Curated annotation (Swiss-Prot):
Enzyme class: hydrolase
SUPFAM superfamilies in UniProt: dUTPase-like (SSF51283)
Pathway this chain belongs to: Pyrimidine metabolism; dUMP biosynthesis; dUMP from dCTP (dUTP route): step 2/2
Residues that hold substrate according to the record: R71, S72, G73, N84, L88, V89, D90, M98
Keywords, sorted A to Z: Hydrolase, Magnesium, Metal-binding, Nucleotide metabolism
Organism: Shewanella oneidensis (strain ATCC 700550 / JCM 31522 / CIP 106686 / LMG 19005 / NCIMB 14063 / MR-1)
Protein name per UniProt: Deoxyuridine 5'-triphosphate nucleotidohydrolase
Signal peptide annotation: none
Length: 152
């Protein structure tokens, strides 16, 4: 199923020097976001930098949201993860997409212009309405949490 999402190009290099975000394969869940920086950027160990992607989106449908997620190779090989762990893009947000890059390694990381640094995934959203109760109906789990079910 393909849902149309409005996309605004904020950096003219997108669509000319660098492709629009797209799914790499028919089974891809995410589209790569690129570092649309003006010059090479070095992220020191322990440092967090906000990196522009050169695009803005407007999801519009309140039944959807976008998530900005890390790319597995950057985290595993270089220690580059998202400073906020997951970026949530609400359906009514229309501003530029930025990526908070955190270098959790002990070596500097160099980000080149146009490098793929995160991925954009669209997910369904359910807005809940709370119902106040004095007690919950019992369940098998009850109040067990934080390791309650063990590791084996």
């Amino acid at each position: 199923m393909k849902t149309p999402i409005e996309l605004k190009i904020l950096d003219s290099r997108i669509g000319s020097e660098f492709p629009l975000p797209a799914y790499a394969t028919p089974g891809s869940a995410g589209m790569d976001l690129r570092a649309m920086i003006d010059t090479t950027m070095t992220i020191a160990p322990g440092e967090t930098q906000l990196v522009p992607t050169g695009i803005a989106i407007h999801v519009a449908d309140p039944g959807l949201a976008a998530l900005i997620l890390p790319r597995s190779g950057l985290g595993h090989k270089h220690g580059i993860v998202l400073g906020n762990l997951v970026g949530l893009v609400d359906s009514d947000y229309q501003g530029p997409l930025m990526v908070s890059c955190w270098n959790r390694s002990d070596t500097p990381f160099t980000l080149e212009i146009g490098d793929r640094l995160a991925q954009l995934v669209f997910v369904p959203v359910v807005q809940a309405q709370f119902k106040l109760v004095d007690e919950f109906d019992s369940s098998d789990r009850g109040e067990g949490g934080f390791g309650h079910s063990g590791t084996k």
